[in-house]
Amino acid sequence: MRNVLYLLNYAGKAGTERYVETLVRYLNHREINAFFAYHEGGLLVERLEELGVPTRQIELRSRFDLRAARTLARLCEEWSIDLVHCQFLREHYIALLAKQYNKRIRVVYTNHFILPNNAVTRFTNRLLDKRQDQMIAVCTRGREQLIANGWKGDRIRVIFNGVDLEAWAGPRSESTLRQELGLPEDRFVMLCASRFADDKGHRYLIHSVKRLTELTSVPFTLVLAGDGPLLEETKQQVRDLGLEDKVVFLGFRKDIKNLYKGSDLYVNSSRHEALSFLIIEAMAAGLPVIATDIAGNPDIVNDEAGCGLLVEYDNPDSMAVAIKCFLEEPDFLSKCREGALRTVAEKFEVHKMVEDTAKVYELACAR
């Protein structure tokens, strides 16, 4: 059984942390023995420790931190690590540099952001590529971007994120969301759950809601769940546009299933996204989706899937018209609900993700 060290700079509560936790929950003590090292602690550390995973905090000051590379190499020797699985560029470079001090370890990197690198980083990627054992892109465009960023494509596998269908099943009547907010059962509820940061597109989403009020008389409520640096700014925007009766802020919530089950539609307004766990979870809970046409979203929402609509980023008119379709066409809403459940079962089921990732570990260790 392989000893796998998951390495993460910040062990918080976002999608990448969910990815790591999912792999650990399904692989630990079955296919691998899991270990975890991190720079800045957070909720993920607590969750992994509850699962009995050994954890260690190490300093990761920059992507070229040789001291961190030596520390990581020693930690891998102490724990007899076979493979280090990294999630972001900083810890990825450090893990590749650590191979200089510990020849045994192999490195797998999962790309969670679809962003072009600058010329210096592309050059560095090409230099380090010979040390790279395997890469995982969570969407089709992710693989294309990795190659454009200087990594060779022969060791890049596309593995979609996956969720447990049973975990998100259940009747809508289970939800207490509408009761909590004082909303009638026939109110159309849209949900967006994400961190309030610039790349999540809340400002554009709020402008879309303002435009929607001009297009329809059907009552609706937009529910926003999450926290982050732009939360207060977004609340002020809602007040400035006079949308206090249309938009509700919940803050950070752990009862995400309760929110899905109390909603009619999931909305993703991100500018950057690899392959959103939240979109897939919402679909597994039976929600159709509106998502921006960026990065991995077209792998989820497309004509074949029939689970929702793609819209242009930062185009409030496009978003408003898409929402109006679901508001005023109940048959279309029902059809997309069916498409959402079918698509998750066919393409985004957790066991496929986990099994394919375990195969990548074996490919890496065989090099």
Regions found by a protein language model. Give the residues of each.
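Aromatic "clamp/platform" in nucleotide-sugar-dependent glycosyltransferases that forms part
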Residues: 252, 271
